[in-house]
């Protein structure tokens, strides 16, 4: 391990850098967003680890994780948890000064088990407890590490914390405490507290284990559940892989995998992705196998099998784990000098220990003088400085810090009190008060850390009164968000009317047929125009669209506390209403972002007969090349980009809408006559649908399932439509600004075509937006009615919904969507099915034209999965190229792990390759069919079966 550090320093020598009271030395580790350096305290000459996080590589979610990690570490002081010593911020980096662990992590320790005998810090350990053959560690060492890991976990559970990323890479090792006392260890680490290197359990002659990396940690009481997919796949609990809600037992599964790896030398389950890993876990059926020659004791094997239970209910719980004889009994097989002596009374754990004279602290100014949670954060106030970990949020009335108090005033073990209400229009809903995620919990602690220090413990009645005030404040904030949702529908229609009646667009920029397009909008409500030969013609005609706008008085309902949370999306460049739409829609419909990799439940996937809807009525004029083939000018190029971005986003929304229509039409089967079709009549949103007339033999469970799936898909389509309108609004604002300041260039054919096309698309988006809102409201009422008809013991029955979440609600009913039902998950599964069907047809050479359409639709659906609801777009699209040039920020969606995103991106890339291959085959067939000398009656004709029947607008084809 020392050789690794020296090799890295030789490969990448860096000049020393001063960071506060510390000097940054050589690099010792590197991750995706941070680099870890060895550092030294300038006065005491003791060593620290400095984790330098590059702020330019962090998006909003990662900054929240960093803030959560800092906030949690400030309040954790335990010998087996890596302590945060200090925190400094510059304009480009946040430097976390942490305890230095000279032996690296446990994964490296296991990997280099055969060379530990030659290492100065571990040679004595190997001499006393040699590792057995086969890749495992000596059981004495394994039990020693397990005892220390369990001590840290008990400390976390006492504080209702769950780590969620327990793995060997996050378990760091320090030289044995005895080596420090004897002076054998030459590298003396800086102490985060007086007992940082005094183990609470285990052997003092063996290396000391510490848990690190609390980026995914969060507060989770014993009775609460979480549902965010996070952690490392190989060590991730199966309930997380199944996208089910989970509790703190997920950490115990990770402990079981780590223990298995120490005993065997490899993880119990290995796979290349989440789906394959879950398949192997399920296939194993809780039969954990060990090599025949493995020397592990029966007690260890029994403990591992108890921890690696697929069903969390059958898994050991924390009291059983902490009381296990492997944890509590003395370690068998110890040598005489390691045998335990007479028991000593445990040292009381104080929030702040009194610093003692030691080689770690050489002067009084270097001793810890700050209570936990009040460590100094050195900031450099400069213009343009990115937000720090302590101000990555809006400041409310409760955010004003109180003066810091001395450690004598800090009551030991005083629990934090609930913060006061924050009067913000965008304040989070009730869910953040009941089932907080890691970010919200961290921000709440950051808000009131200094306000409760030194205050007497509040009585239960005071806490209940405070909770009631909090709920009232959050209700008011939510109502404000709800009003904004309806305002968004008004703004969409107002902007479309503005473009439709703009003298600048109508006076010289309109083209023949523009008026006809407007009239078609009022009659067909934006149904896509297809040619008679298109395979989608019947599908397009089959669905009559409801006329009318969304009702301003329609009653939207709040969601319950255990529903999925829809994270905030970045604020649009032209309108903050889009963000409010997405946030309030999430609370209203229970929509949350879930990583798309999942095992499809029975009955969730739509039938393979689904045909993708084509793009909005195609425009045959090309913007990418002018009439003479020359490159367009700068202004024209900007117009081209705007058109392409709007069309791409609208096309993705159209694909999602088509998928939702499949669910909708299963709920409301089409009658032979459109006049009798319930979906063709204007819907009265004040009257719930008559299930007896429209169910058409569907079971109640099927109605609820279809309604939930249609609802989340319609909400996803709404968010994409809103994004298209925001892009168009940005283009229109720029045009108006140029006109005001006299910067508008001379009108040319390019600008005329761009204005016409954008106006054309905006009118289509407007009518589709109104249509989706209308249908989403109908599906919502259908869902409420279906849930009422469920058996009383069904989890989705209204009587089984959370009561606390509806306290103070004046609404008639709440909309609750089952956990795991998300648009992204449905879209991912559907795209996989479509691509597989297309691949089979491609291999057999059947219906290649339809293969092309299917591939394009599957690609668009996956692009919508990866689509952020802010002003960022897909890899390879103009929006992302623009954002990357501005800040280089990597798009990582809320709750979508980097690994999952990479899997989806690779799948899209593979589909594009297959699409290119199909198009080549279609072109070859078309060329062959036109090779014979044409007759007089068939000159110039080519078989339509070999040509794509849909003409896509420029910018709609997948990015190459």
Curated annotation (Swiss-Prot):
Binding annotation for ATP: 28-36, 51
Group of enzyme by EC: transferase
Catalytic activity: L-seryl-[protein] + ATP = O-phospho-L-seryl-[protein] + ADP + H(+); L-threonyl-[protein] + ATP = O-phospho-L-threonyl-[protein] + ADP + H(+)
Record's bilayer topology term: Peripheral membrane protein
Biased composition (Basic and acidic residues): 550-566, 789-800
CDD domains given in the database record: STKc_ATG1_ULK_like
EC annotation from Swiss-Prot or TrEMBL: 2.7.11.1
Domain Protein kinase: 22-327
GO CC terms in record: autophagosome; cytosol; phagophore assembly site membrane
Active site positions: 165
Start-end of Low complexity biased regions: 801-815
Location (main, coarse): cytoplasm
Record Pfam families: ATG1-like_MIT1 (PF12063), ATG1-like_MIT2 (PF21127), Pkinase (PF00069)
Record key words, sorted: ATP-binding, Autophagy, Cytoplasm, Kinase, Membrane, Nucleotide-binding, Protein transport, Serine/threonine-protein kinase, Transferase, Transport
Region Disordered: start-end pairs: 333-467, 503-538, 550-571, 673-694, 789-815, 926-960
Subcellular location: Cytoplasm; Preautophagosomal structure membrane
Keyword Protein transport: yes
Biased amino acid composition, Polar residues: 376-388, 520-536, 930-951
Example GO biological process: piecemeal microautophagy of the nucleus
A Gene Ontology molecular function term of the record: ATP binding
Family the UniProt entry places it in: Belongs to the protein kinase superfamily. Ser/Thr protein kinase family. APG1/unc-51/ULK1 subfamily.
Entry function: Serine/threonine protein kinase involved in the cytoplasm to vacuole transport (Cvt) and found to be essential in autophagy, where it is required for the formation of autophagosomes. Involved in the clearance of protein aggregates which cannot be efficiently cleared by the proteasome. Required for selective autophagic degradation of the nucleus (nucleophagy) as well as for mitophagy which contributes to regulate mitochondrial quantity and quality by eliminating the mitochondria to a basal level to fulfill cellular energy requirements and preventing excess ROS production.
Assembly mode: Homodimer. Forms a ternary complex with ATG13 and ATG17.
The protein's name: Serine/threonine-protein kinase atg1
Upper classification of the organism: Eukaryota, Fungi, Dikarya, Ascomycota, Pezizomycotina
């Amino acid at each position: 391990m020392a050789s690794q550090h020296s090799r890295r320093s030789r490969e990448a020598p860096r000049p020393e850098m001063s960071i506060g009271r510390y000097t940054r030395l050589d690099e010792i580790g590197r991750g995706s967003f941070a680099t870890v350096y060895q550092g030294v305290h300038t006065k005491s000459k003791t060593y620290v680890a400095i984790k330098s996080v590059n702020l330019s590589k962090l998006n909003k979610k990662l900054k929240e994780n960093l803030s959560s990690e800092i906030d949690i570490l400030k309040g954790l002081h335990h010998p087996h948890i890596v302590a945060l010593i200090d925190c400094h911020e510059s304009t480009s980096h946040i430097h976390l000064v942490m305890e230095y662990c000279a032996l690296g992590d446990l994964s490296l320790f296991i990997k280099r088990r055969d060379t530990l005998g030659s290492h100065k810090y571990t040679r004595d350990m190997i001499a006393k407890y040699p590792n057995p053959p086969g890749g495992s560690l000596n059981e004495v060492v394994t039990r020693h590490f397990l005892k220390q890991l369990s001590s840290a976990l008990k400390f976390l559970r006492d504080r209702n914390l769950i780590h969620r990323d327990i793995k060997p890479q996050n378990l760091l090792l320090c030289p044995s405490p005895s080596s420090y006392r004897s002076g054998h260890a030459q590298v003396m680490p800086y102490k985060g507290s007086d007992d940082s290197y005094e183990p609470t359990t285990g052997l003092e002659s063996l290396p000391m284990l510490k848990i690190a990396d609390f980026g995914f940690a969060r507060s989770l009481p014993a009775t609460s559940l979480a549902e965010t997919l996070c952690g490392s796949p190989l060590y991730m609990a199966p309930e997380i892989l199944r996208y089910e809600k989970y509790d703190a037992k997920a950490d115990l599964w990770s402990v079981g995998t780590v223990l298995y790896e120490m005993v065997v030398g490899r993880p119990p389950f290995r796979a290349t992705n989440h789906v394959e890993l879950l398949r192997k876990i399920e296939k194993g059926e809780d039969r954990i196998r060990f090599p025949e020659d493995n020397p592990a004791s029966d007690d260890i094997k029994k403990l591992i099998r108890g921890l690696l239970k697929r069903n969390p209910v059958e898994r050991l719980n924390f009291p059983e784990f902490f009381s296990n004889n492997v944890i509590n009994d003395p370690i068998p097989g110890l040598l005489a000098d390691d045998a335990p002596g007479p028991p000593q009374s445990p040292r009381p754990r104080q929030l702040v220990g009194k610093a003692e004279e030691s080689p770690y602290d050489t002067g009084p100014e270097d001793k810890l003088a700050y209570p936990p949670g009040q460590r100094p954060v050195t900031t450099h106030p400069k213009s343009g400085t990115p937000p720090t970990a302590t101000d990555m949020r809006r400041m409310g009335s409760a955010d004003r810090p109180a003066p810091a108090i001395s450690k004598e005033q800090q009551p030991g073990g005083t629990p934090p009190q609930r913060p006061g209400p924050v009067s913000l229009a965008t304040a989070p809903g009730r869910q953040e008060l009941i089932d907080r995620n890691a970010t919200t919990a961290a921000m709440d602690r950051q808000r009131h850390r200094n306000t409760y220090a030194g205050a007497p413990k509040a009585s239960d009645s005071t806490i209940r009164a405070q909770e009631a005030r909090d709920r009232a404040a959050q209700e008011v904030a939510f109502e404000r968000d709800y009003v904004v949702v309806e305002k968004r529908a008004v703004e969409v229609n107002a902007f479309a009317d503005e473009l439709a009646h703009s003298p600048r667009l109508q006076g010289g920029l309109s083209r023949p047929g523009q008026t006809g397009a407007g009239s078609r909008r009022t009659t067909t409500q934006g149904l896509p125009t297809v040619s008679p030969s298109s395979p989608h013609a019947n599908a397009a005609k089959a669905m009559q669209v409801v006329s009318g706008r969304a009702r301003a008085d329609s009653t939207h309902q709040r969601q319950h506390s255990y529903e999925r949370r829809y994270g905030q999306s970045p604020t649009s460049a032209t309108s903050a209403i889009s963000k409010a739409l997405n946030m309030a829609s999430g609370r209203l419909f229970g929509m949350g972002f879930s990583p798309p990799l999942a095992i499809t439940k029975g009955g969730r996937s739509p039938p393979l007969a689904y045909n993708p809807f084509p793009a909005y009525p195609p425009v045959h004029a090309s913007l990418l090349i002018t009439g003479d083939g020359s490159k367009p000018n700068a202004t024209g190029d900007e117009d081209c980009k705007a058109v392409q971005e709007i069309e791409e986003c609208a096309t993705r929304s159209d694909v999602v809408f088509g998928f939702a229509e499949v669910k909708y039409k299963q709920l409301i089967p089409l009658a032979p006559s459109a006049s009798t079709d319930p979906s063709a009549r204007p819907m009265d949103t004040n009257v719930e649908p008559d299930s007896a007339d429209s169910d058409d033999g569907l079971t109640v469970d099927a109605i609820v399932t279809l309604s939930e799936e249609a609802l989340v898909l319609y909400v996803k389509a709404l968010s994409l439509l809103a994004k298209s309108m925001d892009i168009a609004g940005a283009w229109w604002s720029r045009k108006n600004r140029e006109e005001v300041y006299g910067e508008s260039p001379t009108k040319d054919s390019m600008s005329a075509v761009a204005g016409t096309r954008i106006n054309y698309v905006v009118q289509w988006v407007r009518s589709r937006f109104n249509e989706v809102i209308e249908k989403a409201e109908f599906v919502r009422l259908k869902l409420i009615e279906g849930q009422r008809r469920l058996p009383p013991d069904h989890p989705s029955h209204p009587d089984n919904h959370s009561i606390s979440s509806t306290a103070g609600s004046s609404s008639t009913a709440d909309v609750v969507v089952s956990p795991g039902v998300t648009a992204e998950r449905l879209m991912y599964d559907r795209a996989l099915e479509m691509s597989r069907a297309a691949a089979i047809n491609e291999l057999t050479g059947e219906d290649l034209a339809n293969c092309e359409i299917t591939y394009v639709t599957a690609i668009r659906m996956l692009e919508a999965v990866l689509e952020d609801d802010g002003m960022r777009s897909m890899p390879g699209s103009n929006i992302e190229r623009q954002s990357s040039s501005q800040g280089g920020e990597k798009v990582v969606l809320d709750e979508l792990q980097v690994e999952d995103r990479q899997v989806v991106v690779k799948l899209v890339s593979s589909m594009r390759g297959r699409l290119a291959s199909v198009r080549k085959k279609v072109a070859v067939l078309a060329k062959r069919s036109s090779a014979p000398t044409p007759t007089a009656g068939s000159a110039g004709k080519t078989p339509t079966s070999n040509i794509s029947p849909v003409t896509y607008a420029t910018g709609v084809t997948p990015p190459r």
